């Protein structure tokens, strides 16, 4: 089983926002080896700049190191640019969210059992994917309201 993290859940966990406990449950499963955990490199960049604004660049990097130590791996998205741009053109999510969906779909296409989850927050960019064939099984929200 695999989980792909959007930036929002990782920020919620790192800054103890609403829903942090739910994200911690997912991260514990990654740490324990029960799940493979990924974050796309663009979502990691999003995490870093927001965390740096909230705290500092040093703290942002410390949070990223903690996530790596828990077993969260960076998912290289270089080969997904065409698919992400198609998602952006068709469904209009932010570019970071388009890449998160593209990464989850890429992992899902290589998983015979379709056990890939994209963990997201309350952002409405994912609403359309929850109602679209081929994506609905991927999306799971850790909270229903923004922090």
Regions found by a protein language model. Name each.
Residues 2, 73, 101, 109-147:
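Acidic, PIN/NYN-like endoribonuclease modules and their adjacent C-terminal/linker elements
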Residues 51-77:
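Helix-adjacent hinge/juxtasegments
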Residues 7, 41, 97-101:
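Conserved glycosyltransferase catalytic-site signature
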């Amino acid at each position: 089983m695999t989980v792909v993290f959007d930036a929002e859940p990782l920020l919620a966990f790192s800054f103890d926002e609403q829903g942090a406990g739910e994200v911690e449950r997912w991260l514990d499963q990654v740490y324990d080896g029960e799940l493979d955990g990924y974050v796309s490199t663009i979502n990691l960049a999003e995490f870093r700049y927001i965390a740096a604004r909230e705290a500092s660049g040093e703290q942002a990097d410390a949070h990223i190191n903690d996530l790596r130590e828990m077993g969260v791996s960076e998912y290289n998205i270089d080969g997904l640019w065409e698919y992400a741009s198609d998602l952006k053109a068709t469904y209009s999510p932010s570019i970071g969210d388009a890449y998160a969906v593209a990464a989850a779909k890429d992992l899902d296409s290589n998983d015979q059992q379709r056990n890939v989850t994209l963990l997201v927050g309350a952002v409405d960019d994912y609403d359309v994917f929850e109602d679209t064939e081929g994506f609905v099984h991927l999306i799971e929200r850790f909270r229903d309201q923004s922090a």
